[in-house]
């Protein structure tokens, strides 16, 4: 599955070879929910925060509004290969938005903890950004897609879950969702997802966010959602980078986990089915199935195919 298929599926094709670009820093209001249940049931009571991102546009004074791709980084923050994808989209005439959920909260990484900035907070950020950018004079609000990697892949994937999405906004939607190696081991009881296309890309050997649950996830949702999966052979987490494969001893391996996501937005522990609705409860829940130590790095063949 190539990224160009993803973009051409929804958007008109533009090309601005070699032109200059302009950048805008866009700021908007968001909040700091920990769990999806915080968003669904208590969104008005969450700590408020200002979040920003960088919008990149062709400098040409075109009369047509532009399609936009919102990018969401993973637990290590924005990496070289993430920017390469944004640059590729820009070269093909798309506007891009680099969402800075981490920098807005003075965080550089959540590896080995996953509590400082959560999937739920970043999904809220993404929709608040979409609301803001939908009013931008050069953006076509009906042609805004989201792409994310790892933690950002979770944002891209679960921003399509309607109980969560509708609690945030019913006024705007993403035209498509592309998720690189997301946590498919979160199993939703409620299978109501957006009808916009969702595509998951993951490595066969991923021991951070394993591929097997993605097969189950897609099979479960395929009757009601427009969702597909591509698995790359002999590939680890971060297969789309050019970095060598290394062992990250702090990273959480979820290969033995399958967490249930209930109707209210609580992610439940294995066995005990208690909600992991706070940092302490999440840490306790991880004791039942999570191990330390994961492999991460690129695969040249998979990278080429994914582009």
Positions of PLM-derived features:
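N-terminal cap/lid segment of alpha/beta-hydrolase-fold proteins
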Residues: 21-64
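Cap/lid segment of the alpha/beta-hydrolase catalytic domain
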Residues: 39, 75-83, 87-91, 101-121, ...
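Short substrate-entry loop that stabilizes the transition state in hydrolases
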Residues: 59-66, 71-108, 185-187, 205-211
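Alpha/beta-hydrolase active-site loop
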Residues: 114-137, 158, 306
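Alpha/beta-hydrolase fold nucleophile elbow
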Residues: 138-150
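Short beta-strand/loop motif that positions the catalytic acidic residue
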Residues: 194, 200-202, 206
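Short alpha-helix in the alpha/beta-hydrolase fold that links the catalytic acid
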Residues: 196, 209-220, 244
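C-terminal catalytic histidine-bearing segment of alpha/beta-hydrolase fold enzymes
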Residues: 226-307
């Amino acid at each position: 599955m190539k990224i160009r298929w993803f973009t051409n599926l929804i958007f008109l094709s533009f090309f601005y070879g070699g032109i200059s670009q302009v950048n805008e820093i866009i700021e908007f209001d968001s909040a700091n929910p920990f769990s999806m249940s915080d968003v669904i049931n208590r969104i008005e009571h969450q700590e408020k925060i200002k979040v920003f991102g960088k919008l990149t546009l062709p400098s040409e004074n075109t009369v047509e509004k532009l399609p936009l791709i919102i990018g969401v980084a993973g637990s290590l923050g924005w990496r070289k290969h993430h920017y390469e994808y944004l640059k590729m989209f820009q070269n093909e005439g798309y506007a891009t938005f680099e969402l800075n959920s981490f920098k807005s909260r003075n965080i550089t990484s959540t590896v080995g903890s996953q509590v400082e900035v959560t999937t739920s907070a970043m999904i809220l950020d993404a929709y608040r950004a979409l609301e803001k950018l939908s009013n931008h004079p050069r953006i076509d609000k009906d042609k805004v897609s989201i792409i994310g990697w790892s933690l950002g892949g979770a944002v891209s994937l679960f921003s399509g879950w309607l109980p969560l999405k509708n609690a945030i906004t019913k006024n705007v939607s993403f035209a498509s969702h592309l998720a690189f190696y997301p946590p498919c081991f979160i199993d939703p009881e409620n299978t109501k997802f957006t009808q916009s296309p969702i595509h998951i890309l993951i490595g066969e050997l991923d021991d951070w966010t394993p591929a097997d649950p993605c097969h189950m996830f897609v099979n479960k949702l395929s009757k009601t959602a427009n969702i597909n999966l591509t698995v790359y052979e002999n590939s680890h987490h971060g297969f789309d980078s050019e970095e060598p494969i290394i062992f990250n001893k702090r990273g959480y391996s979820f290969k033995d986990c399958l967490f249930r996501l209930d109707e209210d937005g609580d992610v439940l522990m294995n066995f005990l089915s208690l909600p992991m609705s706070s940092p302490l409860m999440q840490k306790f829940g991880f004791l039942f199935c999570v191990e330390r130590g994961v492999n991460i790095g690129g695969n040249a063949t998979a990278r080429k195919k994914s582009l």
